[in-house]
Amino acid sequence: MSKKNFLFTSESVSEGHPDKVADRISDAVVDAFLGADPYARVAVETLVTTNLIVMAGEVRGPASVNAALMDELARHAVKDIGYEQDGFHWKNAEIINRVHSQSADIAQGVDAAGDKDEGAGDQGIMFGYACNETPVLMPAPIYYSHEILKSLAEARHSGAAPQLLPDSKSQVTLEYRDGKPVRATSVVVSHQHVDGLSQADIKEIVRPHVKNVLPEGWMPAEDQFYVNPTGRFVIGGPDGDTGLTGRKIIVDTYGGAAPHGGGAFSGKDPTKVDRSAAYAARYLAKNVVASGLADKCVIQLSYAIGVSKPLSVYVDTSGTCKVDEDKLAVVLQQLVDLSPRGIRTHLGLNKPIYARTAAYGHFGRSPDADGGFSWEKTDLVEQLKKAF
């Protein structure tokens, strides 16, 4: 997004979107394993469709996290999201579990042995991004898309909007002038609802949530404010569309405002650099912007399976850097050990902190007291300032 004047659009989906239901179940399993053993290995994929949940993947961890417990975790996740519909109900959905032991070939590449440092769990590239468009240093379109759906979900869970059901999507288009967002030119919200309500009814339920989230004066013209454009959205969730873990990687990150390496997050323990290195890249980029060294920052990391150190570290501030970018890349690597183990140790990732990340974005969230969203901390700011 280097042009000065343009329109840019991002979307979000709610916790009840089929793909997010799958993400939530997969991350509930990750949390169960890490809660029982901080060094457990987990790679679990979930498929959800009409009254069916399928889990498959590879794990290495305590026997206490067995098929019965995983089934219970899946039902609890679906119940917490709010699905009690004929076509998808937490109580009576069929569950097929095909989770099995991790490959010994993968384990030997990842495990530390003797004087050999623990290697990355796979090859790959990961990106992190931050910009000063919002207080949480996230791009504005994805930030407001998330906030609209979070507000609606809170109203649904609290009982303030009982007409709403779990599945929903949002899309926000912002106008940028001189590189800064100035207003919303269009907003789209599609929200599942109980039968018997008109499109106009849902629009009036949704309207105050959009208006309260957007800055004053940013509400789009009425003919550019779309709510349930098809007119009806009663059948939804996994009963309407099949969901899979890892299919909302742009929603999970920066809404298309920054590159993506292609690896999904949910269902993976933090030895998987798809997840942990993407968190580290966000952490570094956010601290660069929070320190005032740049207005925006993209960081790319790359890894090879079984190799502990990153193969490359790339920093790009789109010409906004107030210091030398090459030196910045060196300093960042001095401040944080970017080996898989170094990242997990620095950010405290071997904890059951992942189910909460499964909806409304992995980034732009507030760090939790128990270590959740640790990659959103800005505790490198003073060290970065001193380095320059």
From Swiss-Prot:
Alphabetical GO biological process terms: one-carbon metabolic process; S-adenosylmethionine biosynthetic process
Reaction equations catalysed: L-methionine + ATP + H2O = S-adenosyl-L-methionine + phosphate + diphosphate
NCBIfam families assigned: metK
Gene3D superfamilies: 3.30.300.10
Keyword annotations: ATP-binding, Cytoplasm, Magnesium, Metal-binding, Nucleotide-binding, One-carbon metabolism, Potassium, Transferase
GO molecular function: ATP binding; magnesium ion binding; methionine adenosyltransferase activity
PANTHER family given in the database record: S-ADENOSYLMETHIONINE SYNTHETASE
Protein's UniProt name: S-adenosylmethionine synthase
Gene Ontology annotations for the cellular component aspect, listed alphabetically: cytoplasm
Associated pathway: Amino-acid biosynthesis; S-adenosyl-L-methionine biosynthesis; S-adenosyl-L-methionine from L-methionine: step 1/1
UniProt function note: Catalyzes the formation of S-adenosylmethionine (AdoMet) from methionine and ATP. The overall synthetic reaction is composed of two sequential steps, AdoMet formation and the subsequent tripolyphosphate hydrolysis which occurs prior to release of AdoMet from the enzyme.
Pfam family, one: S-AdoMet_synt_N
Residues that bind K(+): E45
Broad class of enzyme this protein falls into: transferase
Similarity comment: family membership: Belongs to the AdoMet synthase family.
